[in-house]
Amino acid sequence: MVYTDTVKLLQECDAGTKMAVTTIDEVLEKVRDTEMKELLQESKDHHEKLGNEIHSLLNSHGTEEKDPTLMAKGMSWMKTNMKMGMDASDATVADLITDGCNMGIKSLNKYLNQYKEADHKSKDISTKLISIEEKLCKDLSKYL
């Protein structure tokens, strides 16, 4: 059970990092404020670095990476484009990214509780990813 929970938790973290990177990429070029753009780029870099670590661990377990579901990606894309179409401001970007972070934090905590038998390393990665999301939410709050 430890192996199964470990792999499943890592796969959920993998999907989460990919979703974060994709979402940040969708809005980054639309951000006007230089500091906000730097915050988003820094967070994207953290997500990519952690994603690479997750990929290595999944490979060492002989399992495949996990992409976000098509439904999640499609809904995110629609919401982003609809909101940005109505108001392409930095406040809208901050709102969208904050919503995404909150969904990520909620999901990751759910998976930490669900995959209790996961190994220490995968739990640490989940916790690190939650911290990255929480920091980004806090940093973006001044743009809301």
Predicted regions and their residues:
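Amphipathic alpha-helical hairpins
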Residues: 1-144
